[in-house]
């Protein structure tokens, strides 16, 4: 199953990229949402190959996932690999500078089933793809707004024009 979303952010691509690779902030966000995060000892802390083991409560069960950074292109692209017992996939975040102070963030998410149960679940999601797509777009817009707020605060403004 493939999903995409995009949003425009009033911040330079370098600032958006720095926000997206802030591992500590992402770990706090995931923990706030109820997941457990573990940094595997056999993976680097930053850069390509860095990863996290997640235990995520989903539909009444705890799902275990391994998320790793597969590729980084500074100020342009991040690629994450996702592996679980039932699914695998990838997430690609691309940054397109629109102007020196504006960046378009594009997210492409692909999830592939590894088991029959996962295939049935993804087929069910395909039936509700409109809702799933809308939720993803909303999350990406919220991420963009959060990065804009961080940028405004870093420049000493309150975000009001």
Residue ranges of predicted features:
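Glycine-rich portal/gate segments that line the openings of hydrophobic small-molecule binding cavities
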Residues: 28, 38-85, 138-156
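Beta-strand/loop substructures that line and gate deep hydrophobic ligand-binding cavities in soluble
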Residues: 81-134
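A short, structured loop/turn motif at beta-sheet edges
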Residues: 13, 45, 70-75, 94-104
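Short, surface-exposed coil-to-beta transition loops
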Residues: 2-4, 62-66, 87-92
């Amino acid at each position: 199953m493939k999903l995409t979303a995009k949003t425009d952010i009033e911040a330079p691509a370098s600032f958006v990229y720095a926000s997206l690779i802030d591992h500590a902030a992402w770990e706090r966000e995931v923990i706030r949402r109820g997941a457990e995060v573990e940094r595997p000892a056999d993976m680097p802390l930053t850069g390509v190959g860095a990863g996290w083991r997640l235990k995520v409560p989903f539909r009444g069960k705890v799902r275990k996932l391994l998320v790793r950074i597969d590729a980084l292109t500074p100020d342009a692209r991040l690629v994450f690999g996702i592996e679980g017992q039932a699914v695998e996939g990838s997430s690609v975040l691309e940054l397109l500078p629109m102007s020196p102070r504006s960046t378009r963030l594009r997210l492409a998410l692909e999830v592939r089933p590894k088991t029959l149960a996962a295939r049935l679940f993804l087929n069910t999601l395909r039936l509700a793809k409109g809702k799933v797509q809308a939720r993803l777009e909303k999350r990406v817009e919220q991420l963009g707004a959060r990065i804009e707020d961080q940028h405004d605060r870093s420049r000493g403004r309150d975000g009001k024009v």
